[in-house]
């Protein structure tokens, strides 16, 4: 199975939820472009830890895995990699201190994280 084999319903969901749009809501990204954006963003991280990393080769590997539908990252990664928000996690673990103040600080922090995730 490959990118050209995805169903009409899958394309509909990608267009509604995942692909980049301009300020008027017009699509400005293709499915292929989304996979390239995600692959480039994921590969670029390696250069932070290894100055000799071949990020182009890594990006091509990620891209091929995604376009062959052998591996797809989680929704936040597909939606946000390479974009301003950059939120790639689908869940958070927040510490909660054993006090009323600590509990409400945790609630506040959770609300702030959730708010950023839906921007």
Name each model-derived stretch.
Residues 1-118:
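Extended catalytic cores of very large enzyme megasubunits
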């Amino acid at each position: 199975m490959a990118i050209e084999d995805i169903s009409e319903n899958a394309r509909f969901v990608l267009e509604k939820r995942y692909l980049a749009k301009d300020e008027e809501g017009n699509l400005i990204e293709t499915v292929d472009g989304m996979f390239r954006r995600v692959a480039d963003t994921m590969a670029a991280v390696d250069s932070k830890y290894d100055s000799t990393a071949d990020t182009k080769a890594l990006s091509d590997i990620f891209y091929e895995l995604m376009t062959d539908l052998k591996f797809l990252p989680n929704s936040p990664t597909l939606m946000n990699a390479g974009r301003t928000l950059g939120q790639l996690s689908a869940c958070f673990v927040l510490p909660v201190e054993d006090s009323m103040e600590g509990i409400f600080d945790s609630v506040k922090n959770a609300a702030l994280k959730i708010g950023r995730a839906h921007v």
